[in-house]
């Protein structure tokens, strides 16, 4: 039984174990089935077109959509089946748990009943045990006298006392005239000098046990000075006295007797009796504590009682009482010290309540009875001591003789301890004697007093009587032992039942937790199923819409495909006809070559003359086809050129201000020249002078107006657009793994990166072609500059995350990346005046003329040639961000050398000289572009030049430098090879190379423009933080004059702190800033300790001002009682005590507000506190209360108590109820309820008199057995009623702070 008692099992009556799930592995716990992971239906959405733009067939798209819908339906059915299985599993488990809980509830009820029955059987036995134990002590005598002798001191000589046995002390009187000079004194117990404190307390312990059983016990320590009285009671640090040993024994016995239905409480009182005047030794406590009455009704004293929970608290309280005792040794010798331990026992089942006390009294020195040489100063003290000790001796003698009544009215000590001297009380007198011969007279006097108290003769007494009572005591002891054994057995049985009950409760708790878990799992699954159904329905709706859109798109694509097929068919026919003509021409040519050699020269010339028109005709036909193809290419180039022109306009609109226009730019060369140079020069064929996407720097703005500009992150944007959301989603969801080949990835990434430039208010399902980008660009330009800034800010994080993600693949167009980053840097410059003062190096510092002649191969192999150019920055009003040395880009151009030999070779090869010149120029331009690109990689100084210099101005400066350093380019020419054309081509090649290099990343960091953007952004953040630091520092030193100024300063500092935290949060989430691993540097946050301290001080000052206003509001209420005025002044004093928590700058304002309020309160006239008069005149009219709130108190009777409460104009609690409960339909009375502080100093009878003026329900609800209990109940009732009245809630809170509502037990 003991082995299985602590285990939890299912095998109980009426409970079936859970059945395992079919297919589950043996030994595995029962768990709800889990579904296999499944791909979302949207994973089967049709993929985009490939790199060549081919369209997926319509049938395949529809089949994929049908498969997606089918998968969604299957997922929905699986989820529904899982939810059904889990619901069935939960219901089955809940049913089993419910049945088992019912069984446990029945078992718990039976165990409770058994425990009550056992308690009922034990209680009479415990009472019988206590009675028998008390009878045993009574048989031994209600008054016991012990005698104790201290050891001899070194200077006291020989001893005059002997100890024949444990009950007799023999004193050598030294009187030679007597036959036997030795006298014997018999006591209940005699202790020699060798007896310690422990053995003494062993005989005192039965009296302590009797005190715990409910009987009053008094222990007196009597004897001459320096005989050991104080040592017996107090002891030493290593050998405790009766004070501590008695309480420790009480504490241990109470712990062993305490059950779940009973409880012991201990209190201590200590007083000093001097000249019949009582002084409380524990009354120095500042906080109000409960008091207890001691003594007879005619002459009682009220002493402070302190509750002690353990021996340590008792020791501290006793130590405090002894320290408060008089320090005058003579006064201590003639005073009584009374230490009382009050014992309260309560049984919550039977309702039994017992009260007893254990009093330990340190009596004055016994020589006070013999002092004959008392002077005038202490004769009064000795007279009072003599009277007190004589009366105590008479009382003890009367008790020993079993005479009634006890003479308790003769002295103050007997009046205070009247309930401990007589009746069933137990009294112990411990007599202390000195063994020295010099103290013989005092020893004999002490022994004579104790013999008189014991009522014993100076003989051995009647041995027969003693033997008889000893036999009776032995019988009682044996009977007591049997009863104790029976009680012990019953207690063991109760402990076993309690253990079983605890185990049952633990099982109930476990099952209840299992039930809660099952309910949570069931509710979670139902919620998940519901959300899954909603999500599937939404997906189905979206797929349906997408299906409709795809159908419309497919229909349009079919039309376009049909048109393209027709055009392709026409083109095929044209090609076939041209091929036929070409074949005929070739055949004619072969015939001409195979003709006879004998023909004459004239015939040959005539044949060639005749064939020339035919070849010209066929050549004209092929040239027409070529011309058509060139026209289409020209249209495409013109479209791209228009696109870049519109792009340049977009850049200009982002930064241009009123009165500032863009710099003039050189016109671009013709398409003919571009096509002649070939397609290898990339994007320079159509852009020329517009090759770099840069725009003029705006004029400096007002610093005051833009000092608070903040670089906002994407999550801080307040306004979004549907198209911006689409672009963000497209950039973040771009997956390079969906493309086949690097070319396809590059094409998709570059097209996607161009979307931010051509953003309009419509959504794209696929990447739009270049023709659509032009229309988009026009729409963006039409939207205005403000809208463009919003669009840039909206997609900022997505753009830079996309660029960072694609940088390692090296597939993006670096010129396009440069344009994007320059766009964002200039947008930042337009909003940040602190960046507009940055000075950059001129373009001449980045160009250097090569002085060495080297071949093209050597130039390509060692390019770019760089030489350091040292220069000094201007440290004037403008600042420089790029402080590194600027290196020059070496331009290696040689003049063209014309030779007749090369012209002859070209003519022999059939190549026109102009065509060859264009070919050579294109190769040289490509070489310069590559060198310029390599030079620009990671060059932040060059990046700053591009950002801060307009595009047209930068290209003009490059052309001017080329014309100045290469004089052979300055010759005027009218064709493409002329100076003007060459300067334009060279400057464009350098610009394109630099632009491409600035957008090329250099791992592990990013490209030069990205590094520059990171540094600019950090500078903006740092400027904003320092600006907020300056504002906060100014506010922190400003002196507050009045409450409005305090509130304004606090609000301003909180606003600045909020902005600073917001900026720090933006810095942590900004994707532009480079991390430490990427080469970025951290931003230091300026210290804000002083500002934080001032803000905390202002918050405290604001709270103090609010409390001052509350005091002023309460002081305006009439009438103003004296107690309320005192409470208000104390509240102001508390506020003055809170001033050290403020800074020195806030002290004047706080002190001014408090002192003004104090003057107002002190100047008010108060009404005296007259509770009786107020209660007699507290009848009001119902019209004075604007609103009544009804409360119903259910007390277990047939009719509940109904009380209506409200507030009058003086903010006092007013109630309306029946005057008598027995007459519920009688007249209702209206009374003002006094505050709990009114009853603080009233007696119990006075409180009853106050309640007689109120409705009877108040008396029944608040009246207790004692005054303290009544005050505690009334405080809770008053708080309950006042909390129901809205107008009194603030007053109730103030009363709680003032400690008016305080339980007596606390």
Swiss-Prot record:
Superkingdom of this protein's organism: Eukaryota
Single GO term (MF): microtubule binding
Transmembrane regions listed in the UniProt entry: none
Keyword terms, alphabetized: ATP-binding, Coiled coil, Microtubule, Motor protein, Nucleotide-binding
InterPro entries according to UniProt: Kinesin-like_fam, Kinesin_motor_dom, Kinesin_motor_dom_sf, P-loop_NTPase
Keyword Mitochondrion: no
GO annotation terms (biological process): microtubule-based movement; microtubule-based process
Source species of the chain: Oryza sativa subsp. japonica (Rice)
Binding residues annotated for ATP, in chain numbering: 223-230
Biased composition annotated in UniProt, kind: Low complexity: 855-867
Family, similarity comment: Belongs to the TRAFAC class myosin-kinesin ATPase superfamily. Kinesin family. KIN-14 subfamily.
Chain residue ranges for the region called Disordered: 592-627, 657-710, 849-881
Parts forming coiled coils: 466-507, 540-595
Residue stretches of biased makeup (Polar residues): 592-611, 660-677
A GO CC term attached to the entry: microtubule cytoskeleton
Positions of the Kinesin motor domain: 142-456
Protein name: Kinesin-like protein KIN-14L
